[in-house]
Design a protein with these regions (language model features):
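N-terminal transmembrane alpha-helices
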Residues: 2-38, 52-67, 71, 96-103, ...
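Transmembrane helical elements of multi-pass membrane transporters/channels
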Residues: 12-31, 133, 144, 167, ...
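Small-residue-rich hydrophobic transmembrane alpha-helices
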Residues: 44-104, 141-160, 254, 268-331, ...
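Short alpha-helical transmembrane segments in multi-pass integral membrane proteins
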Residues: 1-14, 72-137, 181-237, 293-358, ...
C-alpha cells in the first residue's frame, strides 16, 4: 500500500471487506428472516434486539484487535519482519484470553443485562436462551476477528471474504435445517450461527498457519510480548473503550425502545438488520483507511497518507448516502420481509425514515476515526465519541426522548449525535495534527 496508485490500493482493499461484511450481514438477516417467518414476532424480538447487547460485551476486545491491526500494519509497512511476527503472536495470545473471558461473562451476565434493558417477560426466556448459546461459542467470533485483523493489516482483504462466504452458506443451510426442518426454536438459530462462525475461524487460522509470509502463526510461539502488548493496548484500549461506550449508549436507546413493547422491539430489531447494510461501505473504508494510513506513516509517506485519507473519506460518504436513500425508499417492503404484522412494519419504517438520510454523518465520523487510529491517535475518536455518542446521547434519551412519550424522539438520538461528532472530527482533521503525530512521538522517545 506504500507504492502505486492511492485510490486503487484503497478500493482494492475496501471492496473485499465490503463483500465480506455483506455476506456476514446476510447471514445475520437470514437468522431474523427464518425466526420471524417460522417462529413469530416474539421470537423475532428476542433475536432482533441482540446486536447492542453482543456489542456491549465484545466491543472492548474488538477495539483492541483494531489496535493490534494498526501495530502489525505499521511493522509491515516498515518491512520489519521480526516486529510483524512478534505482533501477530501477541495478538493471537490476546485473542485466546479474550475469547474465554467474554464466554464466561456473557453466559453469566445475560439474564441480568436483559432484565436491566427492560426486556418484556414474553420475550425474556427466548432472549436468555439465544444469548447463552451465542456467547457459549463467542470464542469463534473472537478468533475469526483475530485472523481477519492480521490479514487486513498486511493488505489482504480477500481471504477473510472467502471465509465469510463459506460461513454465510453454512449459516443459511443450518438455519433452515434446524428451525424449518427440525422444528427447533431460537436455540436452532443460535446454534447455526455458532457453527458457521467456527467454520470461518478454522479456515482463517488454517491459512495463517500455512502461509509463507512473516505473519505466519506458529502456535508454539504464541505468547505475550511485553513491549508489543503495551503497543497493542495503547492503541487498542481507546478504540475498545470507544466501542464500549457506544454500546452502553445504544443499550440505553434499546431499553427505551423496549418500553413500547414486543412489536416495537421486533420492528426496530428488523430495521437494525437492514441498517447493517448501510454500515457496510462505512466499515469497509474505515478499515481500509486505518491500514493504508498505518502502512504509509510507517514508511514515512506523509503526503500519500493525506491524499489517501481525503479520497477514502469522500468515497465512504457518497456510498453510505446512496445506501441510506435506498433503504429510506424501500423501508416498508424491507421490514415486511421479516414479519408481516402491520405494527412491526410501522415501527421499523418509522425508524428507517428518521435516520437513513443522515448516514453521511455516520460515515464521516467513522472514516475520520479510521484515519486517526491508523495515525496512532486512537484517543481522539474515543474522546469525541465518549462525549457525543455516550454522554450527549444518553442525556438526550433520559431528558428529552423518554419525557416526550414519542418513540420517534428516541430515534432522533442517532442523527443528532452523529452531527455533533462530525463537527468535532472535521475541526480536528483540518488541523492536520494527526499526520506527524508518530514522527513527533518517535523523536521524543
Amino acid at each position: 500500500m506504500t507504492e502505486g496508485s492511492v485510490w486503487r490500493h484503497i478500493v482494492r482493499f475496501a471492496l473485499p471487506v465490503f463483500w465480506g461484511n455483506l455476506f456476514q450481514q446476510l447471514y445475520n438477516v437470514v437468522d431474523s428472516l427464518v425466526v420471524g417467518n417460522f417462529l413469530g414476532s416474539d421470537a423475532l424480538a428476542a433475536v432482533g434486539s441482540s446486536s447492542h447487547l453482543i456489542f456491549l460485551l465484545v466491543g472492548l476486545f474488538s477495539g483492541i484487535f483494531t489496535g493490534a491491526s494498526v501495530v502489525i500494519s505499521r511493522y509491515y509497512g516498515a518491512r520489519d519482519d521480526a516486529g510483524v511476527r512478534t505482533a501477530v503472536h501477541t495478538t493471537v495470545a490476546f485473542g485466546l484470553v479474550a475469547g474465554v473471558v467474554i464466554t464466561i461473562a456473557g453466559v453469566l451476565l445475560t439474564p441480568r443485562l436483559l432484565i436491566w434493558m427492560g426486556t418484556p417477560e414474553s420475550v425474556l426466556p427466548n432472549s436468555i436462551l439465544y444469548f447463552r448459546i451465542y456467547f457459549g461459542g463467542i470464542i469463534f467470533v473472537i478468533l475469526y476477528n483475530t485472523a481477519a485483523g492480521i490479514f487486513q493489516a498486511v493488505g489482504d482483504s480477500r481471504h477473510p471474504l472467502y471465509y465469510l462466504i463459506v460461513s454465510s452458506v453454512v449459516n443459511v443451510v443450518l438455519d433452515l435445517l434446524f428451525v424449518a426442518g427440525f422444528g427447533m426454536g431460537v436455540d436452532g438459530a443460535a446454534l447455526a450461527t455458532v457453527i458457521s462462525q467456527a467454520a470461518s475461524a478454522a479456515l482463517g487460522f488454517w491459512r495463517l498457519c500455512h502461509t509463507t509470509g512473516s505473519y505466519r502463526i506458529w502456535f508454539r510461539k504464541v505468547r505475550f510480548h511485553g513491549r508489543t502488548l503495551r503497543q497493542l493496548l495503547t492503541l487498542g484500549i481507546p478504540s475498545g473503550v470507544q466501542n464500549s461506550i457506544i454500546a452502553i449508549a445504544n443499550v440505553v436507546v434499546q431499553s427505551s425502545i423496549n418500553l413500547y413493547g414486543p412489536m416495537a422491539m421486533a420492528g426496530c430489531g428488523s430495521y437494525s438488520k437492514i441498517e447493517g447494510f448501510g454500515f457496510l461501505p462505512i466499515n469497509s473504508f474505515a478499515l481500509a483507511l486505518a491500514t493504508f494510513i498505518g502502512q504509509n506513516l510507517g514508511a514515512k509517506q506523509y503526503d500519500r497518507a493525506r491524499r489517501g485519507a481525503r479520497f477514502g473519506i469522500l468515497c465512504s460518504l457518497l456510498m453510505a448516502e446512496v445506501v441510506g436513500v435506498g433503504i429510506n425508499l424501500l423501508a416498508p417492503w424491507l421490514i415486511s420481509l421479516f414479519n408481516g404484522d402491520p405494527q412491526v412494519i410501522a415501527f421499523g419504517t418509522l425508524q428507517a425514515r428518521t435516520v437513513t438520510l443522515f448516514y453521511f454523518l455516520l460515515a464521516f465520523s467513522h472514516s475520520v476515526a479510521g484515519v486517526m487510529r491508523g495515525a496512532g491517535r486512537a484517543i481522539v475518536p474515543m474522546l469525541v465519541m465518549l462525549v457525543c455518542w455516550c454522554v450527549i446521547r444518553v442525556s438526550y434519551i433520559m431528558l428529552v426522548a423518554r419525557a416526550s412519550g414519542n418513540i420517534q424522539m428516541v430515534f432522533w438520538a442517532y442523527p443528532i449525535t452523529w452531527a455533533l461528532s462530525s463537527v468535532a472530527f472535521l475541526i480536528y482533521f483540518l488541523r492536520g495534527d494527526w499526520l506527524h503525530y508518530l514522527e513527533r512521538k518517535e523523536r521524543a522517545a
